[in-house]
Design a protein with these regions (language model features):
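N-terminal hydrophobic signal/anchor transmembrane helix of membrane proteins
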Residues: 53-81
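Short secondary-structure capping micro-motifs at structural edges
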Residues: 57, 97-101, 112-118
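Outer-membrane beta-barrel transmembrane domain signature
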Residues: 61, 67, 110-206, 228
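Short glycine/proline- and aromatic-enriched beta-strand/turn motifs that initiate or cap beta-hairpins
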Residues: 1-58
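Membrane-embedded beta-strand positions in outer-membrane beta-barrel channels/transporters
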Residues: 52-56, 109-113, 181, 221-223
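Extracellular/periplasm-exposed beta-strand and loop segments of Gram-negative cell-envelope proteins
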Residues: 34-49, 78-107, 137-179, 203-215, ...
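Outer-membrane beta-barrel "beta-signal"
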Residues: 186, 216-228
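Extended hydrophobic secondary-structure segments that form protein cores and membrane-embedded regions
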Residues: 26-28, 72-74, 128-131
């Protein structure tokens, strides 16, 4: 004797499925390491790596089919050094002099990420994400040290190149850095470990000193977040 199985048409079963993908909002705090890379096309700007931390809060709109849309506000503090070499204007032979740049950068970041979650086992999930983000520069202070002869320093000043500590974002660089990011990570219950890479999309040079002067800022990060 066969017994008809009506569980497929059980309204309570449909309700469980509905609950699994119901719309909700998650709130998280996040902290981690980040590295920014300033990429330049000419010698008037030197490429530089800046290392530091980023902290902030995000909220995610959980959508059906394991998708989610995340945004929030993150604060970043990074620091880096490099040397910019110049031919001496005083030495009789070909000799280089240099400026040591010690740069401290502060910024806010507003990400807009599309997430996709892959359930693995119980509360263990993997996830990937992509989307744009807006990095808003607050300050980029260059605490430079000069190793220049008087003639070289005077020549640089005549070309409009700074030779004293200053904020690069006061008049030199654009504050809005538009990036596109990709990344992923692992999630257990309320905890996430994630990483990603952000590609700089726009030229940050506000007033080019030479034709075609271009600098963009890319970066990667690894962070930990906790869901309330």
């Amino acid at each position: 004797m066969q017994i008809e199985d009506n569980t497929f048409f059980d309204p309570s079963r449909k309700e469980v499925s509905h609950e699994q993908y119901r719309f909700s909002v998650e709130y998280r705090i996040e902290a981690g390491f980040t590295q920014h890379e300033q990429r330049a096309r000419d010698l008037s700007y030197q490429g530089m790596f800046l290392n530091g931390v980023r902290v902030g809060a995000t909220f995610t709109f959980n959508l059906p089919l394991h998708f989610g849309l995340q945004t929030g506000l993150l604060y970043t503090l990074v620091y880096g050094t490099n040397e910019q070499h110049w031919r001496s204007m005083d030495a009789p032979s070909v000799q280089t002099e240099y400026i040591t740049h010690r740069v401290l950068e502060h910024d806010f970041t507003v990400p807009v990420r599309l997430y996709y979650t892959i359930p693995v086992w119980k509360k263990l999930n993997l996830f990937v994400f992509t989307g744009p983000q807006l990095q808003i520069g607050l300050a980029e202070n260059d605490y430079m040290q000069l190793h220049l002869s008087e003639g070289t320093q005077n020549w640089l000043q005549g070309q409009g190149i700074p030779t004293s500590p200053y904020d690069r974002m006061s008049d030199e660089l654009v504050r809005a850095n538009i990036q596109w990011g990709v990344g992923g990570g692992i999630e257990w219950d309320r905890y996430r470990l994630q990483g990603g890479y952000d590609f700089g999309l726009n030229n940050l040079v506000k007033h080019p000193l030479v034709k075609g002067q271009y600098m963009s800022e890319w970066g990667w990060f690894a962070s930990f977040s906790y869901r309330f």
